[in-house]
Regions:
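Extended, low-charge, aliphatic-rich alpha-helical segments
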Residues: 1-93, 97-99, 105, 135-443
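Alpha-helical bundle protein-protein interaction modules that mediate dimerization/oligomerization
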Residues: 95-97, 102-103, 117-132
Length: 443
């Protein structure tokens, strides 16, 4: 694995990437493909003047009028270490007299790159643009075979190729407003949000456009401090050219930070309803009988006693939770009689729906229970497990899955979603190759 993302960011104690992505050459081709109809619409609007009132015979204004605009070629290619090249060829149909028409070809060659502005937002910048205008054929010419440079200045003035070059980036479907949407905050739970912040302008390699991101989490609108990863995340370079449009990568530290944010928001503090009652417990723990006069359902109220931790191995993701369960009874007035430390190691299942990563607890792999405090005398470890392990094994995954049921938004730009997703879990990181899909417009 070669280090790509770490090259983007100087060593810094507070700004360190924990995820990122590579937009591949095939992804660029897809963006060009879906931008082509958009570009044709924009050029048609800009170049074709609205129908004007019928001019007088003496008026020269009817001499040249663009009557059709068709984008014949629209391509985006990668220029390693530099940026992207946008190549456009547009066929124009022009009337130069009531019965005479001619076709011209407008060719645009523009070099683009994504920069980071002083506000920290990514923006598309045009570094070079070369427009040319050629006459292809005319009804007034006998030889229509070969295109040649147009010598008429009228069309140059009417088309205003310089203005087209100044605004060439708007011909793409991801203008700066959409690039800025990459860094928008996304909800995880009602009180917890995630935000992906670009750390630097992207890099350009033969594999694609590489961007490094730092994740921040907000709880109740405030960014929470999270431990910085001791090892800066490095984007793994694909072994070969990937057929996927985009490859997202997330470090082990990202997942640990996510669960730490959920802990900070209180989302992991849950109540687990047991199938036990105070009467059934009294049959096994004799001192229970003197505490409760009526038969009440037993509840386990769990709180985190230290930060969770996620471990990524080949084909396996494990979250380790360190909880304390207050075991008690009473709905209106909860009365605790036991406190148990619960250490859980649970396997995570990862999938993607639209632009969200769905994280769920697939199975609990290991649970350790130890008595912390007791108001009903000493209790053997074996009895603790017999009484409470079934509830913990069933309810802890159910409650965490309930917290994460909405999923965690992936880095994405507005109007695009992800398809053909293939998630692979490796030691220390997760790779998500996927394809882009332009969402259908509604309304």
């Amino acid at each position: 694995l070669s280090i790509l993302l770490s090259l983007l960011v100087p060593a810094h104690t507070t700004r360190s990437p924990d995820c990122g992505g590579i937009l591949t050459p095939s992804g660029l081709r897809y963006l060009a493909e879906v931008s082509k109809p958009h570009a044709e619409s924009v050029l048609r609007r800009d170049l074709m003047a609205p129908p004007a009132p019928a001019p007088s015979p003496a008026s020269p204004s009817s001499r040249n009028q663009i009557i059709s605009v068709k984008v014949d070629k629209f391509s985006l290619t990668l220029i390693p270490d530099t940026g992207m090249r946008l190549s456009i060829e547009v066929d124009l149909g022009i009337t130069s007299a009531p019965s005479a028409t001619k076709e011209m070809r407008l060719s645009i060659l523009a070099d683009l790159h994504v920069d980071m502005n002083p506000e920290g937002n990514l923006e598309l910048v045009t570094s070079d643009c070369k427009p040319t205008l050629e006459e292809v054929q005319s009804t007034e010419e006998s030889d229509r075979s070969a295109p040649h440079k147009s010598s008429g200045l009228d069309m140059d003035k009417q088309i205003n190729v310089e203005k087209i070059c100044l605004e060439v980036s708007k011909l793409l479907l991801f203008p700066n407003e959409r690039l800025m949407s990459l860094a928008a905050p996304f909800p995880i739970t009602p009180s917890c949000q995630v935000q992906y912040l670009p750390l630097a302008a992207p890099m350009y390699s033969e594999q694609g456009i590489i961007i490094s991101l730092q994740t921040t989490f907000q709880v109740a609108g405030t960014v929470i401090p999270l431990p910085v990863s001791p090892v800066p995340f490095s984007m793994p370079e694909p072994a070969s050219s990937s057929p996927s449009h985009l490859i997202l990568a997330f470090s082990e530290h990202f997942y640990t930070s996510l669960f730490s944010a959920l802990e900070e928001s209180g989302a992991l503090n849950v109540s687990l309803l047991s199938s036990l009652t105070t009467a059934t417990l009294a049959e096994r723990i004799t001192q229970m009988g003197s505490l409760f006069q009526e038969d009440l359902p037993v509840v386990l109220q769990t709180v985190t006693r230290s930060s969770p931790h996620v471990v990524l191995e080949e084909d396996k993701a494990i979250v380790k939770l360190f909880l304390t369960a207050q075991i008690g009874a009473g709905s209106a007035l909860f009365q605790s009689f036991l406190s148990v430390n619960v250490d859980v190691a649970a396997r995570l299942h990862l999938s993607v729906a639209d632009t969200r990563m769905i994280i769920s607890v697939a199975a609990i792999e290991d649970v350790e229970l130890s008595l912390a405090t007791s108001d009903v005398g000493p209790i053997m470890a074996a009895l603790l497990e017999e009484l409470f392990l079934p509830t913990i094994r069933e309810e802890v995954p159910a409650q965490i899955n309930k917290v994460l049921r909405q999923g965690v938004f992936l880095p994405h730009i507005a109007s695009f979603t992800y398809t053909d997703v293939n998630i692979t879990i490796h030691k220390d990181y997760v790779l998500i190759p996927c394809n882009l899909q332009l969402e259908a417009r509604t309304g």
